[in-house]
């Protein structure tokens, strides 16, 4: 029974890791497509509406010294003397970014998310099995006490040694949760008692 659960868990875990890998590849492909639209170094000019011309955003891959309205805005929407007035309204900024750093950050984030998802599935599938085993050992310990008094501690010692050796993170987490729940109940009770006393 346990080997069946472990086999299912491994199949599910490998499926999840493959889906996370596929999602990472898909995201990288989209980022590469987006990188074609916007270079890592660019000049961006935001021009507000002027007379009958609507506002517009212009991007161009040029050097920092040429990052101004006259070099970036093409085609110029106004002619003649209005060009200078139009360019004074435009706000141009030189931008640099590292698309490689962005890609690596996203891959690390997705990897951590995939590992956490895999750990959650592990806890969901394996925790009931561990609880059944520990519950079975406690029943065995009780039945050994009921059977007889010849060597009452020999079997109990073996069962306790096996259950202690299997103590893991899940048991510690469950103990911490139970302790926290008891503390919350005690706090609620003390708050309620104080409220009754004050009334």
UniProtKB/Swiss-Prot annotation:
Annotated keywords:
Endosome, Glycoprotein, Lysosome, Membrane, Phosphoprotein, Signal, Transmembrane, Transmembrane helix
Q: How does it sit in the membrane?
A: Single-pass membrane protein
Give the free-text PTM comment from the record. Answer: N-glycosylated.
The identity of this protein, by name, is Transmembrane protein 9B
Q: What is the organism lineage in this UniProt record?
A: Eukaryota, Metazoa, Chordata, Craniata, Vertebrata
Pfam families linked to this entry: Tmemb_9
Instruction: Tell me where the transmembrane regions lie.
Output: 106-126
List of glycosylated residues: 61
Function summary: Enhances production of pro-inflammatory cytokines induced by TNF, IL1B, and TLR ligands. Has a role in TNF activation of both the NF-kappaB and MAPK pathways.
Extent of the signal sequence: 1-34
Keyword ATP-binding attributed: no
């Amino acid at each position: 029974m346990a080997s069946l659960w472990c086999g299912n868990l491994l199949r599910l875990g490998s499926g999840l890791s493959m889906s996370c890998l596929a999602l990472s590849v898909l995201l990288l492909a989209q980022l590469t497509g987006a990188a074609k639209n916007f270079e890592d170094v660019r000049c961006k000019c935001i021009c507000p509406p002027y007379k009958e011309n609507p506002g517009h955003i212009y991007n161009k891959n040029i050097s920092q010294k040429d990052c101004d309205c006259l070099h970036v805005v093409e085609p110029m929407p106004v002619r003649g003397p209005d060009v200078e007035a139009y360019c004074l309204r435009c706000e141009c900024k030189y931008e640099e970014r590292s698309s490689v750093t962005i890609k690596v950050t996203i891959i690390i984030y997705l990897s951590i998310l995939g590992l956490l998802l895999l750990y959650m599935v592990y806890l969901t599938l394996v925790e009931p099995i561990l609880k059944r085993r520990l519950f079975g050992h406690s029943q065995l310990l009780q039945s050994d006490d009921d059977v007889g008094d010849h060597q009452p501690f020999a079997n109990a010692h073996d069962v306790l040694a096996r259950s202690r050796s299997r103590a893991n993170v899940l048991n510690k987490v469950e103990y911490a949760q139970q302790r926290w729940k008891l503390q919350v109940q005690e706090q609620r009770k003390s708050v309620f008692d104080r409220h009754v006393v004050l009334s």
